[in-house]
Amino acid sequence: MTQMTTADVPSMGRRQFMNLLTFGTVTGVALGALYPVAQYFTPYRAGGGGGGTNAKDELGNNVSASGWLSTHPVGDRSLVQGLKGDPTYLIVEGEDAITSYGINAICTHLGCVVPWNSGANKYMCPCHGSQYDSTGKVVRGPAPLSLAIAHVSIEDDQVLVSQWTETDFRTGTDPWWG
């Protein structure tokens, strides 16, 4: 084996050391700042092997099916916090039944919350006039797409909301929000 002499070993000068230190610091800060951005663009996945995420009321409490049905009449469309905390309409379809889907209340035009207009029997966006029928299908623009939908299920009296991945029954196409 040959031994290297000190003349063969490159030395790191003070300037090169400071450059590497600065580069490492800036890289670390940049990666730390980019992490939340990357998380934002990563699709949400409902955790666990269960039926989804608990729907929450306006106070952040889990929604129970029996409690919801006892305080909301047939045909009622009221908002809960659904997937990702988005406002989602739960629809009471019978004295003891909630529809198997919920309608995301975020307008597909510019993101306004779309209220239900019971007199017109449709969702009407207050921002730019987009209108959606009772299932959330767009009937008048400028919104380009129907409102997103999510599965609604009941397990142990808890209302659960989960991602809709099947064909959109309103349009016959794959869901755009998936």
From Swiss-Prot:
<dbReference type="GO" id="GO:0045158">
    <property type="term" value="F:electron transporter, transferring electrons within cytochrome b6/f complex of photosystem II activity"/>
</dbReference>
<keyword id="KW-1015">Disulfide bond</keyword>
<feature type="disulfide bond">
    <location>
        <begin position="112"/>
        <end position="127"/>
    </location>
</feature>
<keyword id="KW-0812">Transmembrane</keyword>
<keyword id="KW-1133">Transmembrane helix</keyword>
<feature type="transmembrane region" description="Helical">
    <location>
        <begin position="20"/>
        <end position="42"/>
    </location>
</feature>
<keyword id="KW-0793">Thylakoid</keyword>
<keyword id="KW-0411">Iron-sulfur</keyword>
<dbReference type="InterPro" id="IPR006311">
    <property type="entry name" value="TAT_signal"/>
</dbReference>
<dbReference type="InterPro" id="IPR036922">
    <property type="entry name" value="Rieske_2Fe-2S_sf"/>
</dbReference>
<keyword id="KW-0001">2Fe-2S</keyword>
<feature type="binding site">
    <location>
        <position position="107"/>
    </location>
    <ligand>
        <name>[2Fe-2S] cluster</name>
    </ligand>
</feature>
<dbReference type="GO" id="GO:0016705">
    <property type="term" value="F:oxidoreductase activity, acting on paired donors, with incorporation or reduction of molecular oxygen"/>
</dbReference>
<comment type="function">
    <text>Component of the cytochrome b6-f complex, which mediates electron transfer between photosystem II (PSII) and photosystem I (PSI), cyclic electron flow around PSI, and state transitions.</text>
</comment>
<dbReference type="Pfam" id="PF25471">
    <property type="entry name" value="TM_PetC"/>
</dbReference>
<keyword id="KW-0408">Iron</keyword>
<comment type="similarity">
    <text>Belongs to the Rieske iron-sulfur protein family.</text>
</comment>
<dbReference type="Pfam" id="PF00355">
    <property type="entry name" value="Rieske"/>
</dbReference>
<keyword id="KW-0813">Transport</keyword>
<feature type="binding site">
    <location>
        <position position="109"/>
    </location>
    <ligand>
        <name>[2Fe-2S] cluster</name>
    </ligand>
</feature>
<dbReference type="GO" id="GO:0015979">
    <property type="term" value="P:photosynthesis"/>
</dbReference>
<dbReference type="InterPro" id="IPR023960">
    <property type="entry name" value="Cyt_b6_f_Rieske"/>
</dbReference>
<feature type="domain" description="Rieske">
    <location>
        <begin position="71"/>
        <end position="161"/>
    </location>
</feature>
<feature type="binding site">
    <location>
        <position position="125"/>
    </location>
    <ligand>
        <name>[2Fe-2S] cluster</name>
    </ligand>
</feature>
<dbReference type="GO" id="GO:0031676">
    <property type="term" value="C:plasma membrane-derived thylakoid membrane"/>
</dbReference>
<dbReference type="GO" id="GO:0009496">
    <property type="term" value="F:plastoquinol--plastocyanin reductase activity"/>
</dbReference>
<dbReference type="InterPro" id="IPR005805">
    <property type="entry name" value="Rieske_Fe-S_prot_C"/>
</dbReference>
<dbReference type="GO" id="GO:0004497">
    <property type="term" value="F:monooxygenase activity"/>
</dbReference>
<dbReference type="InterPro" id="IPR014349">
    <property type="entry name" value="Rieske_Fe-S_prot"/>
</dbReference>
<dbReference type="GO" id="GO:0046872">
    <property type="term" value="F:metal ion binding"/>
</dbReference>
<protein>
    <recommendedName>
        <fullName>Cytochrome b6-f complex iron-sulfur subunit</fullName>
        <ecNumber>7.1.1.6</ecNumber>
    </recommendedName>
</protein>
<keyword id="KW-0249">Electron transport</keyword>
<comment type="subunit">
    <text>The 4 large subunits of the cytochrome b6-f complex are cytochrome b6, subunit IV (17 kDa polypeptide, PetD), cytochrome f and the Rieske protein, while the 4 small subunits are PetG, PetL, PetM and PetN. The complex functions as a dimer.</text>
</comment>
<dbReference type="InterPro" id="IPR017941">
    <property type="entry name" value="Rieske_2Fe-2S"/>
</dbReference>
<feature type="binding site">
    <location>
        <position position="128"/>
    </location>
    <ligand>
        <name>[2Fe-2S] cluster</name>
    </ligand>
</feature>
<keyword id="KW-0479">Metal-binding</keyword>
<dbReference type="GO" id="GO:0051537">
    <property type="term" value="F:2 iron, 2 sulfur cluster binding"/>
</dbReference>
<keyword id="KW-1278">Translocase</keyword>
<keyword id="KW-0472">Membrane</keyword>
